[in-house]
Design a protein with these regions (language model features):
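Acidic, proline/glycine-enriched N-terminal capping motif
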Residues: 1-134
Length: 134
């Protein structure tokens, strides 16, 4: 399990920009990605990147009361965490939970990276031992 506190991410709409037929990471997106890498680098020794199936649980604390779609912040966070070496590839994420929390100045995002299978739901604590088992 890895717990991370990150700055509030730009939405997907601001994370990428389009130039002709190419899609690039915007200046704001590169700044966010650099900040995430710097925060994780300052945390001392870490485990090597997670290589198996994982769950990501995010608590989003927005910077203000504007209307925001939670799914618009997920991609930028996934991209930054992969770039920072938290896991090898976005395709490892089998469970992605995001919940909106109260407004805090400047906003922030708490992220928990968990190895699958889970015994308990990280949000409600209910039993998950049989979820996804066929």
């Amino acid at each position: 399990m890895v717990m991370l506190d990150l700055p509030y991410p730009p939405s997907t709409n601001r994370y990428y920009r389009h130039v002709g037929f190419r899609t690039l990471i915007s200046r704001e997106g590169r700044t966010f990605r650099t900040n995430v890498c710097a925060l994780l680098a300052g945390g001392g020794p870490r485990k090597p990147p997670v290589g198996g199936r994982i769950a990501l649980c995010m608590d989003a604390f927005p910077p203000d009361n504007r209307r925001r779609d939670l799914d618009n912040l997920q991609k930028s966070v996934l991209d930054a965490l992969q770039h920072a070496g938290v896991y090898e590839d976005d395709s490892q994420v089998d469970l992605l939970l995001t919940r909106r929390r109260q407004v805090v100045p400047a906003g922030r995002l708490s992220v928990e990276v968990l190895d699958l299978p889970l015994q308990r739901c990280p949000l409600c604590g209910s039993d998950m031992t049989n979820v996804g088992m066929n």
